[in-house]
Amino acid sequence: MFGPAKGGHFGVHPAAGCPGGVSQPAAGTKAGPAGVCPVGGRTNAMWRLRCKAKEGTHVLQGLSSRTRVRELQGQIAAITGISPGCQRILVGYPPECLDLSNGDTILEDLPIQSGDMLIVEEDQNRPKTSPAFTKYGAPSYVRETLPVLARMAVPADNSCLFTSVYYVVEGGVLNPACAPEMRRFIAQIVASDPDFYSEAILGKTNEEYCDWIKRDDTWGGAIEISILSKFYQCEICVVDTQTVRIDRFGEDAGYTKRVLLIYDGIHYDPLHLVFPDPDTPPLTIFSSYDDIVLVQALELADEARKKRQFTDVNRFTLRCMVCQKGLTGQAEARDHAKETGHTNFGEV
């Protein structure tokens, strides 16, 4: 889990005059807002650890002195493919094996520190497969299940984007109640830089946008994602199930962390890596150098597309829930909202 540069999580207001900025999909962003202080007393510095395995050396992300052994093992499993139960982790010179028997042990209680290189080996004394028995009584072997990238369903309550972003950047915390504060934070950032966040960017005046985004019946999109990418200092990748493409916010900003969302035309869900061991928490934060997870995300989107699990925003049928007028597509809904001020739509 990690917080934004210059501070922690939502719950404080950025200092006046903090720089704004927004990127379009696949475009870079500027540095994030400054002057934000940590919330809840979080002062744990992030650790920089490297792990050396058979296939090469990797940087481990999002760890601190309070990270549990099970979380460390989960990240190593995602990188190396070695399940937590088969891992041997050595450190120091001569290398000594870490005690991994208690998954709740925190890293500061182990003989390691930030900057260390961890040597990861597969324990050859443990079977790579699980024995099973055929009807003839002879043992057969089932191949070990690998971690799977999956969609985490969040409520379809007009705030799915905010709930999804919060889930991934907080390391798997589902908290729909986060949305109002995130909306207010975004409004503050936009209001602080009216020159950049102009009507040409926002599609409405700066003041109108700030009032609009704070309402709980409005949807977030590219502008809000770009602001959150800078605030959390991470690349936010949105995989589209209709076009099977990935829009990468903060791609050129040099962030070391990456999180993923999936979008079906009207709804966002977070993506996380789920491990076979139910005691291993899902992984939501990835290295920005890990392109394998992007391939997995595209495969997930393509699978959803083949099952028609998307909404064509240019052709779907809507009804205005205020005046009951029938509308087709996002453009008609947008025009209707401008003409009437009605913004509560339902899909027919």
Curated annotation (Swiss-Prot):
Positions of region (S2 site): 291-296
Catalytic machinery residues: 157, 160 (nucleophile), 267, 342
Positions annotated to bind substrate: 266
UBX-like: annotated span: 50-128
InterPro entries in the record: OTU1_Ubl, OTU_dom, Papain-like_cys_pep_sf, Ubiquitin-like_domsf, Znf_C2H2_type
A GO MF term: zinc ion binding
Domain notes: The UBAX-like region mediates the interaction with VCP.
Record's subunit section: Interacts with VCP; the interaction is direct. Interacts with FAF2/UBXD8. Interacts with DERL1; however interaction is dependent on the UBAX-like region, suggesting that it may be indirect. Interacts with PLAA, UBXN6 and VCP; may form a complex involved in macroautophagy.
Role of this protein: Hydrolase that can remove conjugated ubiquitin from proteins and participates in endoplasmic reticulum-associated degradation (ERAD) for misfolded lumenal proteins. May act by triming the ubiquitin chain on the associated substrate to facilitate their threading through the VCP/p97 pore. Ubiquitin moieties on substrates may present a steric impediment to the threading process when the substrate is transferred to the VCP pore and threaded through VCP's axial channel. Mediates deubiquitination of 'Lys-27'-, 'Lys-29'- and 'Lys-33'-linked polyubiquitin chains.
Listed name of the protein: Ubiquitin thioesterase OTU1
Organism (species): Bos taurus
